[in-house]
Amino acid sequence: MRISAKTDYALRAAIELASLGTSDPVKGEAIATAQGIPLRFLENILGDLRNAGVVESRRGVEGGYLLARPANEITLADVIRAVDGPLANVAGTRPNLLEYHGSTEKLREIWVGVRAALRSVLEETTLADMAEKKLPKHIEKMVADRDAWEVRI
């Protein structure tokens, strides 16, 4: 699975906002500096997050960005969908809509299973979890397995 820079930056920006735990708007420049994200790229990402209802923006001298909902109500999946669309698709098609025939007919179930696995991690982890540096128990168990860290080519 490839994770785009846009997704990585969006998650880092949203987690940064959650970790600050403030109801005061945070300047885009402050988020960009704290996370080492190019400001121009971040501004577009924050626009996508705003359009999806993940963040709010305030104008003016005291303006900036803040989470639109409590951090414990925003999942990593919410952020990813806001900037990159569905968690899993095959050539732009959602797995459940694919049709395979003959020897490949079970491939659809594989792609649906991949999507379910992504959901089990990304829909079960909130920005609050990340800001508090904790993971859901089932994810802790997954990453505790040394095999999870093995690089395979």
PLM features per residue range, with description:
Residues 71-96, 108, 112-116:
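Conserved segment of winged-helix/HTH DNA-binding domains
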Residues 95-153:
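C-terminal regulatory/oligomerization modules of transcriptional regulators
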